[in-house]
């Protein structure tokens, strides 16, 4: 796939107050030269200072780096806006907020090198890399990331995805994957190593870069926990994707910024029901406690009138799809055009599709529902996704 990589000129500065900056800069330049050998890759160094651009161009051309382009930030912005429908082709590497906003406006991937000056939004929402080697390896994964661990077209306009296998006890393929999934359950991995949410975020962003599936998503949300709270790590994951995709929430949100609310706690299904009961219970447990946030009603009504009511909903796990079933039916009742359900982990069970007729307002609990029909949808599994996650684990948890 053709890629256009826009690098802030800070990446070539040798006077940054960073230990071994000359070695770091030389390593970065050589890795970018290696990436540039791909005939479908174009590398641009960007600045608003034309004199700095001319000096850098002269210096690096004299050293034999003929594949690099040096362009003004206005020129870069114009080029991106002209090809805004081709956002999968763009990668931005910078620590500047101005570059971050250009990436967001074009819904492009934004990578933040830790060794150059970082501004607040860039560092908060970008993919942070610690070394030139991490940067090089991560960019290479963008060329190869083609796999979701599990995918199923539930019905026209509704897709369910899972990023990784959640069955670590007997089914994982590598030690790294086992480590990832154990931490996926206990949330204990912190400190210097990348949190597993970060690894899955990078995996998701790499996949999102290579598909148009998410381009027209207007609303992002997540499944509330059984106790009505929002898992802070999953919320951060969802929020980061929403910001990167340049999607906004309503201004007045007394009920919070998640599109789904759990109004009363519910029993955890795996602690309260037998396996066969969970497989066949459908959305009933969810309907009793789950509703759409009324703060989003005006926005939802507007999107529906414009045929743009397209949503992406995140959850930690998918077993039988009971929660996603509930959400699918709630938003079908509101006239949704497109829904993408993304679970971070899958237990490799079929999706138990159940279609309901819903009466009453779905903006509070108390609506009524009746089952119309049931069917089973199977997932396509791709074990290549296991190795892609495994590779990212290695990239971001190694000593360079």
Regions found by a protein language model. Give the residues of each.
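Asp-based phosphoryl-transfer active-site loop
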Residues: 2-22, 313-315
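PRPP/pyrophosphate-binding module of the type I phosphoribosyltransferase fold
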Residues: 15, 272-369
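Substrate-recognition element of Asp-dependent hydrolases with the DxDx(T/V) motif
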Residues: 20-60, 70-73
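Short glycine-rich phosphate-binding loop at a beta-alpha junction
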Residues: 44-46, 91, 215-226
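Conserved Lys-Pro-Asp/Glu-containing loop-to-beta segment of HAD-superfamily phosphomonoesterases
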Residues: 77-98, 310-313
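Acidic, Mg2+-coordinating phosphoryl-transfer loop and its flanking beta/alpha structural elements
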Residues: 91-129
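PRPP-dependent phosphoribosyltransferase catalytic core
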Residues: 132-172, 325-400
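Active-site-facing substrate-recognition patch
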Residues: 141-219, 227, 267-304
């Amino acid at each position: 796939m053709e890629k256009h990589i826009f690098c802030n000129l800070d990446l070539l500065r040798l006077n940054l107050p960073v230990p071994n900056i000359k070695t770091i800069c030389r390593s970065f330049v050589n890795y970018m030269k290696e990436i540039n050998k791909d005939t479908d890759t174009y590398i641009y160094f960007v600045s608003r200072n034309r004199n700095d651009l001319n000096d850098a161009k002269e210096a690096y051309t004299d050293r034999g780096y003929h594949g690099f382009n040096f362009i003004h930030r206005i020129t870069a912005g114009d080029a991106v806006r002209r090809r805004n429908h081709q956002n999968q082709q763009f990668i931005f590497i910078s620590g500047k907020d101005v570059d971050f906003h250009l990436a967001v406006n074009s819904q492009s991937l934004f990578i933040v090198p830790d060794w150059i000056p970082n501004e607040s939004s860039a560092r908060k929402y970008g993919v942070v890399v610690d070394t030139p080697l991490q940067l090089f390896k991560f960019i290479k994964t963008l060329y190869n990331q083609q796999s979701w661990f599990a995918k199923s077209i539930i019905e026209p306009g509704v897709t369910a995805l899972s990023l990784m296998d959640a069955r670590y006890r007997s089914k994982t393929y590598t030690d790294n994957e086992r480590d990832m999934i154990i931490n996926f359950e206990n949330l204990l991995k912190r400190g210097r190593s990348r949190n597993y949410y970060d690894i899955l975020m990078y995996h998701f962003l790499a996949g999102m870069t290579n598909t148009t599936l998410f381009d027209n998503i207007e609303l992002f949300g997540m499944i509330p926990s059984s106790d009505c709270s929002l898992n802070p790590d999953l919320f951060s994951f969802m929020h980061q994707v929403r910001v990167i995709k340049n999607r906004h929430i309503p201004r007045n949100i007394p009920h919070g910024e998640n599109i789904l609310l759990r109004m009363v706690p519910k029993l955890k299904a795996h602690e309260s029901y037998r396996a066969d009961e969970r497989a066949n219970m459908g959305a009933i447990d969810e309907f009793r406690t789950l509703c759409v946030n009324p703060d989003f009603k005006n926005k939802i009504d507007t999107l529906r009138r414009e045929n743009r009511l397209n949503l992406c909903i995140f959850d930690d796990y998918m077993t039988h799809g009971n929660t996603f079933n509930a959400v699918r039916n709630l938003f079908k009742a509101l006239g949704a055009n497109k829904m993408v359900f993304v679970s971070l982990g899958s237990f490799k069970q079929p999706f138990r599709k159940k279609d309901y007729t819903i009466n009453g307002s779905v903006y509070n609990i108390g609506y009524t529902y009746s089952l119309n029909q049931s069917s089973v949808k199977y997932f396509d599994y791709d074990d290549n996704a296991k190795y892609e996650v495994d590779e990212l684990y290695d990239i971001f948890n190694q000593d360079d």
